[in-house]
């Protein structure tokens, strides 16, 4: 026991912190999916993802390019629809209806954000839940909530994989999710609950936030505030998952967690970049492969 304790805690009580390598884990998943795609191809099943982008938001361009690159890497097809900013909602809905009908399209992804004249909820709802590889359709979210089969939002699904593949137990743990967005916070809390954690969702109106986050065995930060989480928000030995992608005062990429401050007291932590980020695409590709067999 003493040896294990010595390994876990340094002389000054700091931890031997495990750095959770999202790049390596996402690569492992992509290689597994590559194998699955080849097996499907051998059976004559070709998987294709349709990616729709409206306008040319620079961040969206990068994400969309990487998603198509990911398809190429695992050996599935991708169709690309780059529509001008002034595309009407009706035109976009017509394209989605056409792709819903096509037997040679397995997944449909509409990159967000959309221009302000298009209603995102209406667009998401138009996607066939059987092709909703982003897991944003109300039917997909509802299915997740009541434990039925359906696509799961990629970033939170990726975080579960990061934890599992790093041998971090979730069952029975106190998990605090900071942030309540539809894309991350809400599905994250539902997934942790499905893994039998005790889950608290904290947000901008939470009182005594530090007291709440200090309870966490696993803390997931998804608030979009650069370096907000310092060591006084956490207890010793916490596992910290940082979903934030922000720029600090020097325009350097940083997360919602002040990594240098928090890292010494964690048992495990995800870096930014190279933590959660690469997992989103891996899980999107996972959903594309799953679309072949999913029944909703
Ligand atoms: N914009 C930011 N993240 C995402 C995502 O996961 N999916 C889509 N479609 N758009 C996004």
Spans of features found by a protein language model:
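Positively charged, low-complexity intrinsically disordered leader regions
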Residues: 16-45
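Short, well-structured alpha-helical segments in soluble
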Residues: 91-103
